[in-house]
Amino acid sequence: MSRVDPDFPQKVYDVVSKIPRGKVMTYGQIAAYCGAAWASWEVGQIAHNGPSDLPWQRVVNKRGGLAAGWPGGGRATHAELLRAEVVEVSDEYTVDVNKLLWNPSQATLL
């Protein structure tokens, strides 16, 4: 993760902690809000290894796809966590990003 600044993981944690129930953000969108639009892969790595008390279930890929590598059960577990927040998840393990995407202002994230 040497391509990003040392504060990048903390910035990701801060953004993810603010995603409201029933909304999602994409890996690339989070990377852009954190000042490194090209770093979506790094956001995924941070999500996979980050603090478990953050709402990582609200992070999806740009097509609304759920994480195959979700700890403890892959996409099915990811879907279960989102459904518990009354988020509709398709049988293909995707969500409607057009409907659910959270686009906060930078001021909201500060």
What are the functions of these language-model segments?
Residues 1-110:
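Nucleic acid-binding interface residues in structured DNA/RNA-binding domains
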